[in-house]
């Protein structure tokens, strides 16, 4: 037991990256989406991506999560059996399998991430069934378990998400993604469009789950309060480029780039 | 039909079997591909066929493409040979292809069907043509064609079980009773067309060729003879066919698919075989159900013509 713990902690100190982006660029015609972005993400680490609207955060996230091929640059991921691999060189079925097992994607708009005509339990169970679960009782039990983890009432398990509030839909999306125990989860403005009190509760929940499960995450937001609470490290984007990066507290408390200073001061005014 | 000339036994105002040769060749190519890849939906360039609304043209086009002058055609609609649609389709092919027609399953070389598989086991050499309104079993949950195509391509079928999961969570059991999805040859999930799930087990290892035509969606698919066909289910909710506590009121069959028939406005009803030929055949062989002698029941029997014959023959 202690030997295992030791070797595991040794493994962590080696710091094998989970994902590595190198020179990632994506334009839409003449419009720059993101430009020459490079970074390394380690297992269990949470990176926040901040910047004003239009700074390229969603574009970057969509490329990293294999939803949008880049014009230039590579995105490598530590596949369970193959090690670091360029995700855009995987075959499409392999990439799709990765996206629904080892990754999770929480969309800003729950409509993009949930099946609105399928019950909450069915939404959570879908990934399990996709990887071969064929025991109804077990799938349902797991669904109920995850509803509890995201603080949704078990009595809602057979209700459709279209009857849920925005905050509940977002929590259901999280449960639906985490059920296969992914190692990496992508989130685009996870608290966007929610009331402030609902936002705070969702953030608490997310922080708890990410810490408890040791999941790595890339969280895109224009809201510095979100990354303050969730992110270990921060990347600040402007006009598609990363202008500053570092540990969250350092960047927020002692911003070096003038643009970051502006961002931080404007949030202080809010 | 009376005006048929000697050299051709069909109405020569039409090309044989109505469709032009090029169209039939195109459909046959699609059929060959479909047979080679069991359960895979092959797109084809569909044509219009003259028929009553509600029948769709997919099955008709397939039948027109496989039928030859020496074939014998049977047409069933919900198990019955004598509905308006079954009669008019039979008459149509008699006219445009000059083929013999029959109600007897064992005599037919081509059987066109909507909603049932005959009770009598099919033989090698027979062709069963299904009329299909919606070929895509995933469509209800995934409206995007690009996505369902990928799901089939990569055998990503989790969604199919989501559909069954939803059934159980709502009704306590898999409530889907027709169009019940099957896995063909361990590879493609397929809609069996709106047959009752009672008929699903008949598709497996069937000796006949099973061809499916969807006219509106322009898709053809097939199950070659002796192919594995498994109905999807859960370990703790295994697939089951419908069962009835009673036997057929007319022929006493206990292993056939029964339709409920209302006899009067006082709650009188009976359950009879949906396969009218199967039922009549059994009665002809002397099998009797509990209401076989009841005149009201006889009057309501679907295939009254055949039943009357039986009365004469049987006694
Ligand atoms: N699909 C698209 N087509 C054209 N331009 C786009 C598209 N998506 C984003 N853009 C543009 O790319 C830039 C970055 O957008 P985006 O990545 O959405 O930024 P953010 O998420 O930070 O608001 C913006 O100028 C935006 O207008
Ligand atoms: Mg965005
Ligand atoms: Zn009967």
Where are these regions (language model features)?
Chain A
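ABC ATPase NBD Q-loop/coupling interface
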Residues: 74-97
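ABC ATPase "signature
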Residues: 245-246
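Helix-to-loop junction immediately C-terminal to a conserved catalytic motif
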Residues: 65
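Conserved ABC ATPase signature
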Residues: 160-164, 168
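The feature captures the beta-strand-to-loop junction immediately N-terminal to the Walker
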Residues: 50-52
